[in-house]
Amino acid sequence: MEMMRNPKNTKQEIKLAFFYIIDGAIIALMLVLASYMPKVVPVGGFGRIMFYVLFGTFGLFLCIKPHNSPTNRNIFVILDMLKMDNKNYHPIEVNTISSETKRK
């Protein structure tokens, strides 16, 4: 009997149409927060629309995967930055493929 191997990556994301469910949840949460903001800060109709636009845009920003960390969304990158210990140095490890023009 042949030995079975574990897959290299077991992370799965569920996609509806062209949108991941976690991205939709982040944006929906931001829009729910935008609907509650006029109760905290009294504004007119234009202010309510601006809350929806600003919070929706911020939700999209949190969903984007930055190019220096392509596996994590901005929300997780920001949370990692907040959890980071400022008293210790943590080098940024970038695994890149060396180019052919590099001198030996």
Curated annotation (Swiss-Prot):
Topology term for the membrane: Multi-pass membrane protein
Compartments, as annotated in UniProt: Cell membrane
Name of the protein this chain belongs to: Uncharacterized protein pXO2-11/BXB0010/GBAA_pXO2_0010
Transmembrane feature ranges: 16-36, 44-64
Taxonomic superkingdom: Bacteria
Keyword Transmembrane in record: yes
GO terms under cellular component: plasma membrane
Keyword annotations: Cell membrane, Membrane, Plasmid, Transmembrane, Transmembrane helix
